[in-house]
Amino acid sequence: DFDQDKKIESLQNTILNFQSTTAIQYTSNDEFDDSRIDYQDPKFLNTELNYTLNDNSKINIIYNKSANARLGFDQIDTFANSLTLDSSATLSNPYLNYIKKPTNYSFEKHLDYNEKLNTHIIDSSFDESYGVISEYTNTSLKNKFISFSVGYLNEDNAILGSSFSGAFGNLDNSETFFTDSSLAYKMNTNNEILLKMSYANSQANFEDLGLINEFSNIVSSYYSLGYGKKSLLFNNDKSTFSLTRPLKVDSGNIDMAVPKYATSDNEIIRENSNIDLAPDNDQLNLEFNYNINKHNNNFNIGFLSIINNNHSNQSSIENLFKLSYNYLF
C-alpha cells in the first residue's frame, strides 16, 4: 500500500525583500521508488508557496515550473518517468505544454485519506494563453496510482502550438477541451509500468478568415507507455523503456477558396480546396535509457529511435544516441 507519510524539503530564498519557501512535495512509499529527488535539477528548481487549511486542503502557487506541476505522475516519485532524449515525449499532459512560462495556482481537496481533487489555474507570462484543469487522484489501490482529469486550454494566436496569419486569415485564439488519464503499477520492488493517455477537441477562432472558408474542429490524441526496472545488470542501476505516440491530429480539415485565375474584367475566380489535417502515418518513439550510480560516479546511456518523424507519410527512421558521465563531489 502507499505510505502516506509526506516528505518536504525546503530552501529559503530572499525575493523582493521577503522570505518565501521553495518546496517540492511528493508522496514517498514502499512500493514506488523513494530515493531522494535531485532538487538542483533545473526541471525542479522553482518558487512554490504552500498554505494548508484546517480541513486538510492545500493552496499552492507554483512559479516558473512545468504547467504539469502537481498533476499526473508529478505527484509521485517514480523512476520510470525519466525520458531524457526527447523532452516533448515525457509522460505528461501534452496540451498543457503549450502554456509557456507558466504560473500554476492550485487547490487540493482531500476527499479521503487516499483520494483528492486538484483544481489548477495555469497562466502564461509569455502571452495570453491559460488553462484550467480538474483532476481526481486515487492512491488507495495497492501498488497502483490512478488519476483522471478534464481541462480547458485557451491558446493565444495559436492552435495546438501552430499559428498563421496574412492571406490565410488571422487566428485570434483557440479553445481546446481535453481529458487525460495516468496509471502507474508497481509489479514488485524493481519493476513498474506507467501509462499515459490524452484526448482533445480543439476549435480555432479567427479575427478574419482570409482564404479560409471553414476551419473544422480538430480531434487529437496522445499515448505513452513506460516500463522501468531496477537492478538490470547491477544492484544500483536503473533502466527505462518507453513506447510513445506523440500528439497527433486524428481528424480535422480546412476548406479554402484558392484563387485560380482572373477574368478580363479582373474578377477573381476561386476554386474550393479541402485540406485534410490528419496524417496517414503514426510517429512512434522507442526509447531506452540505462543509468548506474556507483561511488559518486554517474553513467547514463540513452537510445531513441523515431519512426515516421512528425507523423510523416513517408516512412523514415531516425536514431539518436546519448552517453554522459557525471561525478558528484
PLM feature segments, named:
Residues 3-187, 198:
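Outer membrane beta-barrel translocator domains of Type V secretion systems
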Residues 11, 327-329:
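C-terminal alpha-helix/helix-terminus motif
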Residues 42, 315-327:
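Beta-barrel outer-membrane channel/assembly domains of diderm bacteria
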Residues 92-99, 106-108, 126, 146-173, ...:
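Outer membrane beta-barrel transmembrane domains
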